[in-house]
Amino acid sequence: MIPSKRILTDKDVKIWEESETREDILSFIESLAKAVEGFENDQVSEPVSDSVQSTIAVLTEIDKLIKLHPVIQDKNTSRFGKVEFRDFYDDVCEKADDLLSSHFPALTSEQIEQLSIYLQESWGNKRRIDYGSGHELNFICFLYGLTHYKIFDLQRDARNLVLVLFIEYLKIMREIETLYWLEPAGSHGVWGLDDYHFLPFLFGAFQLAPHKHLKPKSIHNEELVEMFADKYLYFGCIAFINSVKTSTSLRWHSPMLDDISGVKKWSKVAEGMIKMYKAEVLGKLPIMQHFYFSEFLVCPEGISEPRTHIHNGDEDDDQCCQDGAAHNTWGDCCGIKIPSLYAANAMEKQSHKPIPFD
């Protein structure tokens, strides 16, 4: 079967939420989170398996593709996403199958077909030039698929799937977001964790859960944030947000993170992150309507028939944000264009005038 999108209505979401497939992907995320509990970013599990190293090699090749597509058109004028991202995206799609077959020779052509779409869709949407938690979920599905096909062994590799692979993926995504000014897909704006990512906060909260000295309120201490930004994903995210949202304090530009900082224990934050991910990512139609079902992520019975599938990112998404999604409050996943942080900052530097963004 060719991976396809099937979640089109609120009824589909309800069926999905009660499905074994949704439970499988959530359990996978929880397993990864628990595997990094108490570990800093550089405390990888040694030795790093050949499978993890092969996946790093795939990510490295994708990172190299960015250099082949520098921003030229409207470099300093457009407030929205850079069209060169589409060339990068096309390059990833063109090379994805070969990358997987060369670095994972044990995979069959059918398995590569199943995995490839998740790898392609991990970097953002070609047509809209945006990125959000749904694309981040695709990368997790890619790792899940490699685990399903016995490339990864969770007992051996779980910690490194986060501390090696996810951290490398996040680094590449920050580069892509910064260079191509990707627009936030389905962002809550100031009422979200981050304009783009969710899982670094979830994994980061689990890392810190047993910490005896750092508290959730420590994110307001700039010295502590700077000191621990490279050690813990959560502090790294706070440092990154502070570096791009410089006009006001965290309390004003990220009130949800400010609210979370009032929680007494990181273990409670971690618990809350799982609940929030279930509700705000896996339970939202504007995100899950872009989710691909496949041979290893089986579509539950009763869900709508698949829409037309195109592998090159040019699908029109005619049904996007319709039926149930039009009445969902999560955000404009593919409607109103929202300029990225990077665009707003760059334009502000040029004009020396504040741009209303947050």
Curated annotation (Swiss-Prot):
Write the record's keywords in alphabetical order, separated by commas: Cytoplasm, Isomerase, Rotamase
GO BP field: mitotic spindle organization; response to osmotic stress
The source's domain of life comes to Eukaryota
Q: Which reaction does it catalyse?
A: [protein]-peptidylproline (omega=180) = [protein]-peptidylproline (omega=0)
Which terms in the GO cellular component ontology are assigned? cytoplasm; nucleus; protein phosphatase type 2A complex
Q: Which InterPro entries match?
A: Phstyr_phstse_ac, PTPA_C_lid, PTPA_sf
Recorded GO MF terms = peptidyl-prolyl cis-trans isomerase activity; protein tyrosine phosphatase activator activity
- Tell me the CDD domains matching this sequence: PTPA
Keyword Ribonucleoprotein set for record:
no
Q: Where in the cell is it found?
A: Cytoplasm
EC category name: isomerase
- Give the EC number(s) under which this enzyme is classified: 5.2.1.8
Q: Does the keyword 4Fe-4S apply?
A: no
Q: What does this protein do?
A: PPIases accelerate the folding of proteins. It catalyzes the cis-trans isomerization of proline imidic peptide bonds in oligopeptides. Acts as a regulatory subunit for PP2A-like phosphatases modulating their activity or substrate specificity, probably by inducing a conformational change in the catalytic subunit, a direct target of the PPIase. Can reactivate inactive phosphatase PP2A-phosphatase methylesterase complexes (PP2Ai) in presence of ATP and Mg(2+) by dissociating the inactive form from the complex.
Q: Which family does it belong to?
A: Belongs to the PTPA-type PPIase family.
Enumerate the PANTHER family for this protein.
Answer: SERINE/THREONINE-PROTEIN PHOSPHATASE 2A REGULATORY SUBUNIT B, SERINE_THREONINE-PROTEIN PHOSPHATASE 2A ACTIVATOR 2
Q: What is this protein called?
A: Serine/threonine-protein phosphatase 2A activator 2
Lineage of the source organism? Eukaryota, Fungi, Dikarya, Ascomycota, Saccharomycotina
